[in-house]
Amino acid sequence: MGQKVNPIGFRLGVIKTWDSKWYAEADFAKNLHEDLKIRQFLKKRLYSAGISKIEIERAANKTKINIHAARPGLIIGKKGAEVELLKKDLAAITSKEVFININEVRKPELDAQLVAENVALQLERRIAFRRAMKKSVTSSLKFGAKGIRITCSGRLGGAEMSRTEWYREGRVPLHTLRADIDYGFAEAKTTYGIIGVKVLIFKGEVLPGQ
């Protein structure tokens, strides 16, 4: 079970929490589509800022968005000019007042989503997939990861037949619910087609009371 399922979804309510924090009965579908639009818009607009996670909270006529990014300076801009523009554009999507919080990801090497995007970027630049995987694994372990597994699927190295290759170092216990495992997925758009990149980073066990 732990091998197949999304590791974050598997741990929701145990050691992980939801990225969308709101409750709606009649408007559930509308809010869900709105969340998707917000996330797609922010990912596209702020791609160079290294977006790790976007949390959305809703209350009455207000929407609070927490953005976790590796380079928050690119989002804020000079004297906060970029944030104000962002607020206006998001208010147009949601038709509500929008508040934005920006949190810095201090160690991007330990963030699975950012590692996956980094590997995908290297593959797009025609760097050999084994080299890209090994480089990311080494830097994550250097910054304190207990274990990491990177999987690449697709026409690797321009091969006729698609295949899956993975590289792992350390422990990645997928069945242990108390294991703090971060998961990230990215796609590399190469001339041969799309290569999927999955990253699992084990950061240690969360013990009761922590």
Curated annotation (Swiss-Prot):
GO terms for biological process: translation. InterPro entries: KH_dom, KH_dom-like_a/b, KH_dom_type_2, KH_sf_prok-type, Ribosomal_S3_C_sf, Ribosomal_uS3_bac-typ, Ribosomal_uS3_C, Ribosomal_uS3_CS. Belongs to the universal ribosomal protein uS3 family. This is Small ribosomal subunit protein uS3. Binds the lower part of the 30S subunit head. Binds mRNA in the 70S ribosome, positioning it for translation. The gene is rpsC. Coiled coil: none annotated. Residues 38-106 form the KH type-2 domain. SUPFAM superfamilies: Prokaryotic type KH domain (KH-domain type II), Ribosomal protein S3 C-terminal domain. Signal peptide: none annotated. GO terms for molecular function: mRNA binding; rRNA binding; structural constituent of ribosome. Part of the 30S ribosomal subunit. Forms a tight complex with proteins S10 and S14. Keywords: Ribonucleoprotein, Ribosomal protein, RNA-binding, rRNA-binding.
